[in-house]
Amino acid sequence: MGTVSETSKEQFVKKNKLAICAILRDLQKNDTAVMVTHARGQFISRILDIQPETNQFIFDFGSVENENVLALGAEQLTIIVEPTGAKIEFTCNKLKHVEYLSLPAFSSAIPEQLYFIQRREYFRVSIPQWPAYYCSGKFPDGTQYKYTLADISLGGMGLYAMKGSEFPLQGCSVLRDAAVDLCGFGLFKLDLQFIRALDKQVVNNKGETLTVQRLSFKFLRLSPIQEKGLQRAIFELEKQQTAKARKFQEGL
């Protein structure tokens, strides 16, 4: 997940310690997944406790031991969170290994500043076209559909349809209980609101250039469980693509 540009985010900075602690407490209370990134890796964590009296906050170890070792060796880390309708971003200096409720955890100073960005759009990750991921279900008139996923975010997603294919929806029409299959990353049943259709050229697995329609949808609502599942899936997809790109570059 990319960070917000330096030129645009300064208007969203918060420097009041009480406000920063309140935001961190909300993340803790809602058990919101946070992404921790540094020069040598990234992992998903949860904020466990905020301790303003000692100017510390505690967050959980990652699920992979080597990721935790790399994090402890990092001089600076960035924490990015994307709760519904917002993006939160701040940096931490060197972490400490502590015990919290008899389990290993990280401790860091409460950040001196934090960016709280109200967003209409979320970080969007492109979906690999081979193997394809699909969204399927029924139109309001009862006919079935199955489209290839183009990209996805916590705010919505794009689908590819062959140009000229029948699409019985108008602006603001809703698809109920659409099955979004992210393969090993989960199957989600979601309500989708249609936004627009645009022509786009794509290259298929045979190397052929095709003109398709990109159908844009937004999610009408996400339950906390759906949001957490999608956030994890998006993170893993982005991580997978980064690893493929790095492997390709190393092979040049």
Curated annotation (Swiss-Prot):
Residues 118-236 form the PilZ domain. Pfam families: PilZ, PilZN. GO terms for cellular component: bacterial-type flagellum basal body. Keywords: Bacterial flagellum, c-di-GMP, Nucleotide-binding. GO terms for molecular function: cyclic-di-GMP binding. It is found in: Bacterial flagellum basal body. InterPro entries: PilZ_domain, Split_barrel_FMN-bd, T3SS_YcgR, T3SS_YcgR_PilZN. GO terms for biological process: bacterial-type flagellum-dependent cell motility; regulation of bacterial-type flagellum-dependent cell motility by regulation of motor speed. Monomer. Interacts with the flagellar basal bodies. Belongs to the YcgR family. HAMAP family: YcgR (MF_01457). Acts as a flagellar brake, regulating swimming and swarming in a bis-(3'-5') cyclic diguanylic acid (c-di-GMP)-dependent manner. Binds 1 c-di-GMP dimer per subunit. Increasing levels of c-di-GMP lead to decreased motility. This is Flagellar brake protein YcgR. It comes from Yersinia pseudotuberculosis serotype I (strain IP32953). The gene is ycgR.
